Amino acid sequence: MAIGLNVTEPEVSCADTNCPFHGSLSVRGQTLEGTVASTDMDKTVIVEREYDVRVPKYDRLMKRRSRIPAHAPPCVDLAEGDTVRIAETRPLSKTKSHVVVEQIDTGGAE
């Protein structure tokens, strides 16, 4: 089932209702890329994005990071260090409003 994004669908099927491929979850809004920082929670990963912010006083760049909780469907096998693409969706819980739609690259630790 197509979700309206140019991503590769997972080969494994799942029975998760909050899966954009095999369930009824619709995606809309932003699509972001980041690195999986934590997989400790059940069906949830923390995606970390680093970016630079200019500090005008010192005329330098400062590193910042954002940590976004995202739903990880069972059909997408993730590990810490993987590069993933996440898409915005309706609020799934108090903090989750994104879902993992594609695993771009593995972290190399296999």
From Swiss-Prot:
Any one GO MF term held by the record is: structural constituent of ribosome
UniProt-listed GO biological process terms: translation
* Keyword annotations: Ribonucleoprotein, Ribosomal protein, RNA-binding, rRNA-binding
Q: Which InterPro entries match?
A: NA-bd_OB-fold, Ribosomal_uS17, Ribosomal_uS17_arc/euk, Ribosomal_uS17_archaeal, Ribosomal_uS17_CS
User: What Gene Ontology terms describe where this protein resides (cellular component)?
Assistant: cytosolic small ribosomal subunit
User: Has keyword rRNA-binding?
Assistant: yes
Q: Oligomeric state and partners?
A: Part of the 30S ribosomal subunit.
The function of this protein is: One of the primary rRNA binding proteins, it binds specifically to the 5'-end of 16S ribosomal RNA.
For this chain, the family text in UniProt reads:
Belongs to the universal ribosomal protein uS17 family.
This protein's name: Small ribosomal subunit protein uS17
Write the lineage as a comma-separated list: Archaea, Methanobacteriati, Methanobacteriota, Stenosarchaea group, Halobacteria
